[in-house]
Design a protein with these regions (language model features):
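Short, contiguous, pocket-lining structural segments
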Residues: 3, 24, 107, 111
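C-terminal binding/interaction regions
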Residues: 55-132
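Short amphipathic alpha-helical segments
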Residues: 9-13, 33, 113
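Short glycine/serine- and small hydrophobic-enriched flexible loop segments
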Residues: 34-41, 117-121
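Conserved phosphate/anionic-ligand binding catalytic regions in large, soluble enzymes, centered on
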Residues: 20-34
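Phosphate-handling active-site elements
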Residues: 1-10, 38-60
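A short glycine/serine-rich beta->alpha loop
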Residues: 15-24, 48, 99-106
Length: 132
């Protein structure tokens, strides 16, 4: 399996806070799925077969994340972890999110770590399967 380019990380920079801090799909989940796509996805648009091959492990990541975290939307994850959704694009609410522990031990670091762990497990399973 190829090593993922640093450009992939750069490309995902605006995913935080549920895509540009708007509470949509969790950026950590998107990053985990991007890692699967970077390793297994198609290289050319017409290659639908390869695209479909990436869907199976990407779906595993999505389903496991939703099961462990409780939701895939950043705003809903806020509610689960902090009791309310924060609009992170509003400076006062972003500060309130930080004050509520948004980046503390039970906040985003746990969510990001969970997404990374799930992606790593799926990637290791793929690597093991391909070496058999």
């Amino acid at each position: 399996m190829n090593v993922v380019s640093q450009d992939v990380f750069k490309a995902g920079s605006a995913f935080s806070g549920g895509v540009t801090r708007h509470g949509e799909t969790c950026g950590a989940l998107l990053g985990a799925i991007m890692a699967i796509g970077a390793l297994m996805g198609r290289e050319r648009l017409p290659d639908k077969e390869q695209s479909q091959k990436a869907m199976v492990p990407a779906t595993r990541v999505y389903d496991a994340f939703k099961e462990k975290i409780g939701h895939t939307l950043c705003s809903e994850i806020h509610k689960i972890r902090h009791g309310k959704a924060y609009r992170l694009y509003i400076p006062e609410e972003k500060k309130a999110f930080h004050d509520a522990g948004g980046h503390g031990p039970e906040g985003c670091p746990v969510v990001c770590g969970t997404a990374a762990r799930i992606a790593a497990e799926v990637i290791l399973d793929l690597k093991e399967s391909s070496s058999k």
